[in-house]
Amino acid sequence: MRRYLFSGDFGSLPEKDYDVVIIGSGIAGIYAALHIDPSLKVALVTKVDLTSGSSYYAQGGIAAVIAPTDNFDSHIEDTLTAGAGLCNEEAVRVLVEEGPENIGELCMLNVPFDTNPEGDLQITREGGHSCRRIVHCGGDATGRETTKRLGQIAQTKENIDIYFNTYLIDVLTNDGKVCGAVVCGETPEILRTPSVILATGGIGYLYKYTTNPKGAVGDGLACAVRAGAVSENMEMVQFHPTTLYAPTASDRLFLISEAVRGEGGILRNADGEAFMADKHKLKDLAPRDIVTRHILNELTRRGETNVYLDVSSMSEEFFSKRFPTIFEECRNAGINVPEKPIPVRPAQHYMMGGIKTDLNGMTNVEGLYSCGEAACTGIHGANRLASNSVLECLVFGRRAARHINAAGRTQLPLPEIEISSAAETVSSEEIAADNDKIRQTMADYANAVRRPSGLKKGLSIIRELKAKYDGIALTSKEAYEVCNMTVTAELVFEAAIARKESVGAHYIVED
């Protein structure tokens, strides 16, 4: 595996100095930036803008112990149960116990949470939770409203420079310690820094069908691994049970939030049978991996493309107010909800694994941090509990920032690096074809139901592509992304092959 993707004389690149460089502008990245000491200079780097990441599309809400009838032990137990025995219990306890305080901070920052007529936070229930503990914004627009508000605040901070339309190429190290990052907007440049936070999100765009936006290719993870960081639980890829099924759908599939089932939605097959009724004690609100597999079994058994989410128990007034985004999307697709059921099927949604970190977001590389979906604190184990993801962004984004504030690191000199560019290049058409090949390979062989022979075949295909991109000159964002995709995909296949038993989202059937 090549150490650096950039080819040429690093010393020829323009340089800027920062105390902290944060790659990624979802909730984890922005929230971390807002918690960096105002005396420290921060670069916040985003591939497109502050609303282009997965955070913006998060519908359900944020899980936290807010209700007087709820308690920490219950939330912890629900999280551990969903994680199927692979959670880091210490990390889970930190997540849960620091949750309410972070919700309080968001309230003070005027994030517009939905409230009841008495002015208290409105709380709903989602799959895997034993009680109502999900706070939300705009009905089903929690990610959008939270990201927008945090982004507005970040743009007013004098110590934060935001790099729009800029992507990460390399994390630089000197003697195993972070000393900068190579990024590229119009042209490549070096951001010198002793501390880098990777908040680059998930790997959804490695799959043909996903709820993630196009930029979610695992590039932060790949850069971290090339810099010497360790990955963990890479086989644990979550597939959301319910995305809107439309034959003409775009690459990013529209999510039908878990909260719809929390408010009474029932999964049915084409004959109207509520097939989850006898499959799990929580029925339609069972953990996501379980619901996903039962939907796939139903589709295979019946030879059909989708099942249906029956929402007829809700009035049109309630549904349109509680789920305005879903209501509008369904109506635009010609589905007369809530009278008519919503056609749904599973799609890739979330990465439980990622860059291994401690409870302060620190990796094994000094000065390199990660938080949010890009990181693996061990919270989610083998299967993430609904609405714990945004909570993780908050709790560990803040923890990473506070650790950096206290560390007082000084800038190291940049290493003297000059990498001769390979003579061979590939055309943009070939890069696009290889991108498609990776996504199809992941969909075929690293999906929700896996076979040993398929995993080996998929790994062989990915390794062939990886060797190809390790030996050519990379001259475009698209080429860098495909190279990173091969690194991340290889990690998924290797981890899936290494884990012989089925657990949580990693489900193996014999050939």
PLM segments and residue spans:
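Glycine-rich loop(s) and the adjacent beta-strand/alpha-helix scaffold that form part
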Residues: 195-250, 254, 301, 388-396
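Glycine- and aromatic-enriched mobile tails/lids
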Residues: 1-11, 15-19, 27, 35, ...
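An anion/pyrophosphate-binding glycine-rich loop and adjacent beta-alpha core
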Residues: 223, 229-340, 403-410
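Core beta-strand elements of the Rossmann-like FAD/NAD(P) dinucleotide-binding domain
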Residues: 16-18, 186-195, 364-365
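Conserved redox-cofactor binding core of oxidoreductases
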Residues: 108-187, 199, 243-247
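N-terminal Rossmann-like FAD-binding beta1-loop-alpha1 element of flavoenzymes
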Residues: 20-44
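Short beta-strand to alpha-helix junction loop
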Residues: 87-100, 134-152, 163, 211-218, ...
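Glycine-rich active-site loop/strand segments that organize a redox cofactor
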Residues: 64-95
